Amino acid sequence: MSGAGDASQSPRPDRLLAIRNSIARGERSVREVVTDAIERMSSGNARTNALTQIFADEAMVRAAELDAARSSLGPAGTLPPLFGVPMIIKDNICTRLGRTTCASRMLENYRSPFDATCVRRLVEAGAVIVAKSNLDEFAMGGSGEHSAFGPTRNPWDHSRVPGGSSSGSAAAVAAGYAPAALGSDTGGSIRQPAALCGLTGIKPTYGRVSRLGLVAFASSLDQVGPMAHAAADVAPVLEAIMGHDPGDSTSLDADARQGSELLTTPIVGLRLGVPSQARSSANHASVSRVLEQTIATFRAAGATIVDIDLPHADAGIAAYYIIAPAEASSNLARYDGVRFGRRAAVTQGEPLEAMYTRSRTEGFGSEVQRRIMLGTHVLSSGYYDAYYLTALRARRLIKRDFDRAFSRDPGMPGVHAVLMPAT
């Protein structure tokens, strides 16, 4: 792999709001914007391997429809918020366009009969779906290397990983293929690749964005979220996809402040908590330096920096690697070669179990198999109490630590946000 990457060799791509506003002012057509995105993807994807599918023909049809409708939509201010904006979708989110593969041989030919709620809402907001992105298989991984389609490469430096599991979404946006993309985050899968590719990414509050149409990994942890070059570009995408969905029983009913409103919140008076654990001696020196610079920047802007303690945070990784595989072993049991996924050939007379075993062995990669085995182990009768129930107790203690940090009760820190490294 070459050392230099696409992102360092090309000019910074247009930001989401700039694209949308240029279309609204009539300076560019949707066709021009989408054509540019398709050209970037077609010429660059061989180097980054960020995309599993490019929808060139379908995107151009959609662009023509939007351009034709432009004259009937009234003044620029009445245009849908993402009108004409190219968007990339992580390939574990269902789309009627193309296939939904989860970067796995198990689903390499699967075509969804419906769009995920988040995808439908993007289209309703005027977005143009131009591609689906590579990922660690079934969203299990943190480097972008565990994919049936091959590893994703960081566009800033092809010798480095982009992070994962939303590796393709992050690499695609950083390389300028589209101004924003959807990913999914179970244990850092939006935030970590966004950090490694120099982007802004958010894992929304659980239930804020519908999971209907997201292929399940660990259902109590999975969330869909956006990534883009800056918070101002993430906000309109999050606004478009958030909201209650009766098709998702975990979807929140409560109203939430819009992202654009939060962007205008004054820094002066904000209370930002810095956990003692974030200043760990285990941090890389460059991470510690950037953290302290960020703290100083917020303090200079008028924020109040509050030292807080999250005493059970160190148990988070251990709890995650018990809870997530346990849920995955249950969720992925449906891929048996009968109901879903790849079906291996069997000879006449072989038992049904042979077809199950062969289908799953051929269909799942090594990382997915490892996690299924781990999850099955911690749920087994001899270890359920010692591992799984202990991990659930640890999660409750971690949640309590954060609840106390955000509490406005007398004597509590009462912070508005917690400031800590993403990786």
Model-derived features with residue positions:
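DPxDG-like acidic metal-binding loop motif
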Residues: 96-109, 175-177
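An N-terminal boundary/leader segment
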Residues: 1-60, 293, 300-302
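A short helix-breaking turn/cap at a secondary-structure junction
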Residues: 203-294, 352-358
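Conserved small-residue hinge/capping positions at short loops/turns
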Residues: 75-102, 128-131, 135, 298, ...
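Acyltransferase
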Residues: 30-35, 64-67, 258-259, 283-310, ...
